[in-house]
Amino acid sequence: MIKLTQEEQKYLLDSIRIIPDFPKKGIIFRDITTLLNNKEALNFLLKHLKERYKDYNLDFIAGTESRGFIFASMICAKLNLPFVPIRKPGKLPFETFSCEYDLEYGSDKVELHKDAFKNIQNARVLLVDDLIATGGTAIASYELIQKAGAKCVEACFLINLKDLNGANKLEKLTSVYSVLEI
């Protein structure tokens, strides 16, 4: 497995702006727009991810709304693979599978087109998002991929917020790779 050195991780981490108390007091927000706006850091990240996934024999890359779309579609372009969106309820125009997950206060859902994987049985899918925190969205997305008859071979995140334990929960279901552990 290809992983970054500590020096390479620091380089990427330094390209992400930290905003304290956003969106509410006590939260430390990791603003990836500064990474997206840094062509050297972005190209370094994409080169790394292309190298990591080029031999996974993937059929599709699925990205979760909305920042997962950014990274998933760029990886798709690098690997010449189709992109599959996993969206919030009511955003996809055709028949969907949906999966509900718990939030701190309440619940939410994600949806996936029923024909997203073109009826390729056991299609090999990489799930991509910018960040994993508690794991609710990622686990629901994993379940949608399985429900659609595909196999999530790995979930990839730019950032893993380790203290919130989401990656540990998801690792019980599939392999997890996080570029940066915070």
Swiss-Prot record:
One of its GO terms (biological process) is adenine salvage. Coiled coil: none annotated. SUPFAM superfamilies: PRTase-like. It holds the Pfam family Pribosyltran. Keywords: Cytoplasm, Glycosyltransferase, Purine salvage, Transferase. Signal peptide: none annotated. The keyword Glycosyltransferase applies. It is an enzyme of class 2 (transferase). Its EC number is 2.4.2.7. Pathway: Purine metabolism; AMP biosynthesis via salvage pathway; AMP from adenine: step 1/1. CDD domains: PRTases_typeI (cd06223). It is found in: Cytoplasm. It catalyses: AMP + diphosphate = 5-phospho-alpha-D-ribose 1-diphosphate + adenine. GO terms for molecular function: adenine binding; adenine phosphoribosyltransferase activity; AMP binding. Belongs to the purine/pyrimidine phosphoribosyltransferase family. HAMAP family: Aden_phosphoribosyltr. This is Adenine phosphoribosyltransferase. The gene is apt.
